[in-house]
Amino acid sequence: MPKIIDAKVIITCPGRNFVTLKIMTDEGVYGLGDATLNGRELAVASYLTDHVIPCLIGRDAHRIEDLWQYLYKGAYWRRGPVTMTAIAAVDMALWDIKGKIAGLPVYQLLGGASREGVMVYGHANGTTIEDTVKVALDYQAQGYKAIRLQCGVPGMASTYGVSKDKYFYEPADADLPTENIWNTSKYLRIVPELFKAARESLGWDVHLLHDIHHRLTPIEAGRLGQDLEPYRPFWLEDATPAENQEAFRLIRQHTTAPLAVGEIFNSIWDAKDLIQNQLIDYIRATVVHAGGITHLRRIAALADLYQIRTGCHGATDLSPVCMAAALHFDLSVPNFGIQEYMRHMPETDAVFPHAYTFADGMMHPGDQPGLGVDIDEDLAAGYEYKRAFLPVNRLEDGTMFNW
């Protein structure tokens, strides 16, 4: 058996903060796992160092399921983003090791490919509708078959999903959280105009997506869904705060627009009721925050029973290690829907060389043994951790609101 003899946490900031777990075995094979939790990176790093790594030494790296259960059930204080991100990092690293020892890419260990490639969607954003459509046309020219649309709202200085750079979006700021002002009425007026302009310019052969980011009430989300139905949205993401899961039933009663949720979910228990009551169309749970490949497969299997597809979170707050793991999962799972893909900064790609590729709107994890991603530790050491926080929202009267 390949015995775990050591493990360490690597923290680096090549454009943004990433936490990586590296597990070493007595056979000279190592595996990598992403342990990044945006804005709470050091909490996961400490959890791994103090509470997880000591429990890994001497264990059989091939016993992925047993180690998953050990870390989950042995924690007693189960679930939550810190615990599940730490477990996910271990899980990814162990799949990486297993693939390297077997000489196979991880997707082959998951049952093989269910498709030739993974359809991904890019992010088109701009301060105006015109700017956003221009960027969307650029993505379409690059071969993207699905594009997320976000644009600035007149009268609001800053809006979620809109970056200063048309490709690289990183909302976290150094020092203390930025406080933005939010107006729901203005937002509800601009989004249908954005979709109308996009359809007129891009046509009907491209999927259009939108992220509400938890900021609407159920009835507001239903209204927006109705307004967007003529433009055939691929999905509305995070229409309302996911803690109130019964709210999705009310949204369902008012619109046929497909609903997606789950990027903040940490376990199958967070998604179970939404799936079994068929209140969503896409489950957005991601590898690093939902317990790794092992647990995400369980969530997907449950969703498959109800014809609900996957649509994993894939923003730049996940490292290329997680992106690779997601693509192996996507390629193998039968009820795959779509994969979010935000390109990383060149500095990030240099620190994390990877085998996955993009062509004609599709991605593939590559056929290198394991996950097909590595870390240049010398280069990573040159990018020191920088404390950063995600923004917060306030209504115009000063009331705290969902970002």
Swiss-Prot record:
GO terms for molecular function: magnesium ion binding; mannonate dehydratase activity. GO terms for biological process: amino acid catabolic process; carbohydrate catabolic process. Substrate binds at residues 38, 123, 263, 284, 313, 317, 340. CDD domains: RspA (cd03322). It catalyses: D-mannonate = 2-dehydro-3-deoxy-D-gluconate + H2O. SMART domains: MR_MLE. Its cofactor is Mg(2+). Transmembrane segments: none annotated. PANTHER family: D-GALACTONATE DEHYDRATASE-RELATED (PTHR48080), STARVATION-SENSING PROTEIN RSPA (PTHR48080:SF6). This is D-mannonate dehydratase.
